[in-house]
Amino acid sequence: GFKDWIKGAAKKLIKTVASAIANQ
């Protein structure tokens, strides 16, 4: 459902941000 999509998108966003911070 929509909530599951939001959860997935949030996890992806967190992973992306974490990777960006780690690569600095």
From Swiss-Prot:
Expressed by the skin glands. This is Ascaphin-7. It is found in: Secreted. Belongs to the ascaphin family. It comes from Ascaphus truei. GO terms for biological process: defense response to Gram-negative bacterium; defense response to Gram-positive bacterium. It comes from the Eukaryota. GO terms for cellular component: extracellular region. Antimicrobial peptide that shows higher potency against Gram-negative bacteria than against Gram-positive bacteria. Has a very week hemolytic activity. Disulfide bonds: none annotated.
